[in-house]
Amino acid sequence: MESLLRQLSICNELIAQGSCTAGHIDWLNDFCATFLDFASELKAHLPEVAPRWPAEGGTNIDVETIFLCLTQVVTCITQLERTINIEGASARATPMTRLHFLDRIDWCVRRIIFCLSQLHLQRANDQSNSLEDHTFVELMDLALDHLEAFMETLANTTPTNLLCIVEENELQLGSIVNHIVRHALAFANVALEADKKALSELCETLLSECATFLEDSGELNPGHRKLEGLSLERALYGLETYLNEALLHLIFACIVELENTPISKLRHAPDSEFTEQLVLDFDTNMDRIQQIGVLAIAFSQDIKTKTIVRSCLASLESLDACIVPALQSSALHPHHADILEHHFNEEILIFRNLIHEIIDSRSLINNYLDMLAESIHLAVKRPPRDHLLIVQMGSVLEEHFRLPVNYSELSQLDGKRLHTDFMLILSECLAVVSSPLGEPKRIVKRLKILYSVLAKLRHAIDRNKYVHEDSSASVPNVSSRRQFTNATRTLLRMKSKSKRQRSFVRQRRDCLVPNPQNCSISNSISHQGDLISFQLTEILRIN
């Protein structure tokens, strides 16, 4: 521990030198070498100082924070390297840019020191995670495990012992449900208007069922208690199922908003009123991205994926406070604005890529088909802009299948042919809805064809998935009731875990989903830094 803290202290001293003119590429290499030594030693000792608590269903929050900080330091090193190179080429200093990334590195180093100290204390005191440290999915599992244990005990106990069973679990189950509702309401705050009310009502139902279950703890009728337990379980699954659907709705809307309103628009806003609306829309979308990321972390089973999503969210959160002023004053500080905009686009690209990896393809298609069916049903009453929006949402599916891991689900010949048909009809729909002379009948006809092709594509994915499941069938470790109800989860849990085991570098190189017209972003992503930066990325791979 002392050796680790000593290396971090040296890192802090080097960070202080980075803001001055002496902070050139040699200084950055010195910092990278020191941090590399620290990361190598930490990687060797982390299993000793950071035990897991498997009974709680997750890793320790301090360990996850250390992983996040390591990834953030590497990200900021890459951006500092780019900043120094731009300064050298233009012979013009960018102190604000340096300070932005140095402050982030400094915060991460200080946070690593704090987390290492916390891990040392936890190990000495045998502490465990609190409910505040659990994700939505982990809390759901805890609540369902409590109910499952209650049901099993209920079947094997006498009425006189029933009161003791409930008193033992009552306080913790109620607290778990309260934390589940907090997560759900935090998401509801940024959800689409159509989903906010439903989520709020489902939260109220869950709280009501939980209160009934706990208030009747003195009830000695096992049959009555079982019905109350089943009602609470149904309320939990009802909230989880709808939250999944609302999350997919939000992902469609959020990605379309990113395409329609790129951050670069803030550079050339024509007037203050238009700028104010752009900033408001930008802030709303950033809040939505944060909540999408939080739930993506909850559903992901791979710690590498969790860490990279957290890193993207951390980068976007730190940029949120400074990128708008930087773009609005880009005439005075062009390099500062360019570097921050590049960094923002890069992080958004990685984030979108990871979200598409986590989402189950069939669930995404199902969600879009529901929205498309509603759009077709109300086609006559809806304005042309709504038709354009639903077709643009179809482009999210096009983006989804650009990833090799998702395209591989179309391995059957029919799947690839239907994917080609989908791309063709989607482009036709976009042309029709974009035309000022588009007739409602023509629009509806194209949308119906799009629906038909996507429904067939979904069937092809199902058929391919069933073939793989039949060839590798195994006996599950959960009850049949739990297995059936867990099928409502629409994200990573429904995907093969083997598809997730890919390194950080490979995710950023081979699985991009940029707009084909936007070559600048894809080129910048594939840019390699110096050898030290590459070695850091390699050594910080999380096992």
Curated annotation (Swiss-Prot):
Keyword Cell membrane: yes
Record localization: Cytoplasm; Cell membrane
Cellular component GO terms held in the UniProt record: adherens junction; catenin complex; cytoplasm
Pfam families: Serendipity_A
GO biological process per UniProt: cell migration; cell-cell adhesion; cellularization
Membrane association type: Peripheral membrane protein
InterPro entries cross-referenced by the UniProt entry: Serendipity_A (IPR008837)
Principal location: cytoplasm
Alphabetic keyword roster: Cell membrane, Cytoplasm, Developmental protein, Membrane
Molecular function as annotated in GO: actin filament binding; beta-catenin binding
Keyword S-adenosyl-L-methionine annotated: no
Annotated function: Required for the cellularization of the syncytial blastoderm embryo. Involved in the localization of the actin filaments just prior to and during plasma membrane invagination. Sry-alpha together with nullo and bnk may provide auxiliary functions, by acting both to stabilize a large and dynamic microfilament structure and regulate its functions.
Record-given protein name: Serendipity locus protein alpha
Species of origin: Drosophila subobscura (Fruit fly)
